[in-house]
From Swiss-Prot:
UniProt family annotation: Belongs to the complex I NdhN subunit family.
Catalytic activity annotation: a plastoquinone + NADH + (n+1) H(+)(in) = a plastoquinol + NAD(+) + n H(+)(out); a plastoquinone + NADPH + (n+1) H(+)(in) = a plastoquinol + NADP(+) + n H(+)(out)
Broadest EC class assigned to this enzyme: translocase
Designated gene of the protein: ndhN
Name of the protein described by the UniProt record: NAD(P)H-quinone oxidoreductase subunit N
Source organism of this protein record: Synechococcus sp. (strain CC9902)
GO annotations of cellular component type: plasma membrane-derived thylakoid membrane
Function: NDH-1 shuttles electrons from an unknown electron donor, via FMN and iron-sulfur (Fe-S) centers, to quinones in the respiratory and/or the photosynthetic chain. The immediate electron acceptor for the enzyme in this species is believed to be plastoquinone. Couples the redox reaction to proton translocation, and thus conserves the redox energy in a proton gradient. Cyanobacterial NDH-1 also plays a role in inorganic carbon-concentration.
GO molecular function, one term: oxidoreductase activity, acting on NAD(P)H, quinone or similar compound as acceptor
Subcellular location: Cellular thylakoid membrane
Length: 157
């Protein structure tokens, strides 16, 4: 007779490391599921959570925390008119601005983090230092099993 299988991941060690370091680099199984399991555990611990992709993020700090302008993609020959050749600037609210309202801790999970440069990843670590309620998890690629480490350790900073 086999013993019952224990829970695969309670999230306590992950949460402890996240709170100690602020910014974690994660390698998750490619079949998925680990992200939502961990985010559910963080929500249960009182975090407000959001998941986004690193692709198209632009300047991470500005896109995450400040109101900023974007232009529509350039589609070739357009009438210049009153806007620039690439269109009018549209103001966009920050991705996590609404999550930072209140006193709750915030966890942001960034998918496809391997497309970010070293300086962009370091700026995410600095952002966690400046905003003590913010915790950032950056998925840096796939692995056979879930593993994580402090982002600064991955970058050698």
């Amino acid at each position: 007779m086999h013993a019952p299988m224990p829970l695969l991941l309670t999230g306590r060690g992950f949460r402890r490391d996240l709170e100690a370091n602020g910014c974690l680099a994660v390698h998750a199984p490619l079949e998925g599921g680990a992200e939502t399991r961990l985010l559910r555990r963080l929500r249960g611990a009182g975090y407000r959570t959001r998941m986004t992709s690193a692709r198209g993020l632009g300047d991470p700090e500005v896109f995450l925390t400040q109101k900023h302008g974007i232009r529509p993609p350039h589609l070739g020959h357009n009438c210049v008119g009153r806007g620039a050749a690439v269109g009018e600037v549209q103001q966009v609210v920050p991705l996590i601005g609404d999550l930072l309202d209140g006193d709750d801790s915030v966890a942001l999970w960034i998918l496809e983090g391997q497309v970010l440069s070293r300086s962009e990843l370091l700026s995410l670590c600095d952002l966690c230092k400046r905003e003590p309620r913010l915790r950032i998890i950056v998925e840096m690629g796939g692995a056979r099993s879930l593993r994580w480490q402090p982002m600064k350790a991955l970058l050698g900073a």
